[in-house]
């Protein structure tokens, strides 16, 4: 790998990070706008035209707030916790493909040695396995935040969140196993390409896996109706209680990054990813560009679904949450692996 290739890769990584941060910023605005619509009010509309500068105002607010350290906290672990959550969210995003390969112009091929531009930072053979392995590490940031805060509300929220994430990682992962059985690959690009003729959602094992995945997805991202870790009426804001300013912003952004990543993953696993429907533009240079637009349209729907569910459904009780995961989702996930195995045989 020469210096031109390294520089090109660094620029692409920086661009993808900028896209993710910008998407998170405007996702917060979109959520507040949708919440306002559902509650029959306008939402943010003071910063810029239609409130479009509200994310910038919020970012400046978080960056300029005074950094306060409560006297009882373990400072080193207290600072490490939000960094772990943010790092895991960024690393999980790095293997998500946004589209197919785009051929580069000749002058750029000569300078970089690359023929195609992959619309993802990395494409390892263990793509989906890497994504869930990194996502599962985020639980360390949460439990460290609760423990280092030396606050009973923070600790209770962290314990709840840890138990919830570990419990729902099982059905989430097992639902993906059935898709891996159907497609025969762990690479997200291969899983998307295998759905060129028929989306996985229209196959029996794929439909069951989709239902399991969506429920577990809400629990994994700590969103309503599974936000037991941040139950305001019981735990103030859970493991966030002692965090403010930029440290809280890292947790906040990581949560929205995870929601966007999960929306991308559910699109890639069940809804054809970036495949252009009906074979339109097959082999054409614009196929990748149109594939990107179709992919983003599906992702926008699932990001909207997160918001819609948040402002529609009430919170589960903790015992209901655990019962649903261990008594309902996990048995169905195990059964679906068997169904997927039989499906490819017959």
Swiss-Prot record:
UniProt-listed PROSITE patterns: COMPLEX1_ND1_2
GO cellular component, one term: plasma membrane
Superkingdom to which the source organism belongs: Bacteria
Topology within the bilayer: Multi-pass membrane protein
Pfam families registered for this protein in UniProt: NADHdh (PF00146)
Transmembrane segments: 6-26, 76-96, 128-148, 166-186, 198-218, 260-280, 289-309, 324-344
GO terms (BP aspect): aerobic respiration
UniProt cross-references to InterPro entries, sorted A to Z: NADH_UbQ_OxRdtase_su1/FPO (IPR001694), NADH_UbQ_OxRdtase_su1_CS (IPR018086)
Major location (coarse): membrane
UniProt keywords, alphabetically: Cell inner membrane, Cell membrane, Membrane, NAD, Quinone, Translocase, Transmembrane, Transmembrane helix, Ubiquinone
Any one GO MF annotation of this record: NADH dehydrogenase activity
Reactions accelerated catalytically: a quinone + NADH + 5 H(+)(in) = a quinol + NAD(+) + 4 H(+)(out)
EC number of this enzyme: 7.1.1.-
Position of the signal peptide: none
Localisation per UniProt entry: Cell inner membrane
Protein family (similarity comment): Belongs to the complex I subunit 1 family.
Role according to the record: NDH-1 shuttles electrons from NADH, via FMN and iron-sulfur (Fe-S) centers, to quinones in the respiratory chain. The immediate electron acceptor for the enzyme in this species is believed to be ubiquinone. Couples the redox reaction to proton translocation (for every two electrons transferred, four hydrogen ions are translocated across the cytoplasmic membrane), and thus conserves the redox energy in a proton gradient. This subunit may bind ubiquinone.
Subunit structure: NDH-1 is composed of 14 different subunits. Subunits NuoA, H, J, K, L, M, N constitute the membrane sector of the complex.
Protein name according to UniProt: NADH-quinone oxidoreductase subunit H
């Amino acid at each position: 790998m020469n210096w031109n290739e390294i520089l090109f890769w660094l620029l692409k990584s920086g661009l993808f990070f900028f896209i993710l941060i910008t998407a998170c910023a405007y996702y917060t605005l979109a959520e507040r706008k949708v919440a306002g619509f559902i509650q029959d009010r306008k939402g943010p509309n003071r910063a810029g035209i239609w409130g479009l500068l509200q994310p910038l105002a919020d970012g400046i607010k978080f960056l300029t707030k005074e950094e306060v350290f409560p006297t009882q906290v373990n400072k080193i672990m207290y600072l490490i916790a939000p960094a772990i959550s943010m790092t895991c969210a960024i690393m999980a995003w790095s293997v998500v493909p946004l589209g197919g390969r785009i051929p580069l112009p000749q002058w750029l091929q000569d300078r970089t040695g690359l023929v195609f531009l992959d619309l993802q930072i990395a494409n390892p053979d263990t793509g989906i396995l890497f994504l869930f392995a990194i996502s599962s590490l985020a639980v360390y940031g949460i439990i460290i935040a609760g423990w280092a805060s030396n606050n009973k509300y923070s600790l209770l929220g962290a314990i709840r969140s840890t138990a919830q994430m570990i419990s729902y990682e099982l059905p989430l992962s097992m639902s993906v196993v059935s898709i891996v059985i159907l497609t025969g690959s762990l690479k997200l690009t291969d899983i998307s390409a295998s759905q060129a003729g028929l989306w996985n959602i229209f196959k029996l094992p794929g439909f069951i896996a989709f239902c399991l995945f969506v429920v577990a997805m809400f629990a994994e991202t700590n969103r309503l109706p599974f936000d037991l870790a941040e139950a305001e009426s019981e735990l103030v804001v859970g493991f966030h209680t002692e965090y403010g300013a930029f440290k809280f912003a890292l947790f906040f952004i990581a949560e929205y990054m995870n929601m966007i990543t999960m929306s991308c993953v559910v699109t890639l696993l069940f809804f054809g990813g970036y495949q252009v429907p009906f074979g339109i533009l097959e082999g054409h240079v614009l196929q990748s560009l149109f594939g990107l637009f179709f992919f983003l349209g599906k992702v926008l729907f699932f990001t909207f679904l997160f918001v819609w569910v948040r402002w529609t459904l009430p919170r589960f009780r903790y015992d209901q949450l655990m019962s649903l995961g261990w008594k309902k989702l996990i048995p169905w996930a195990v059964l679906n692996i068997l169904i997927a195995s039989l499906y490819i045989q017959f």
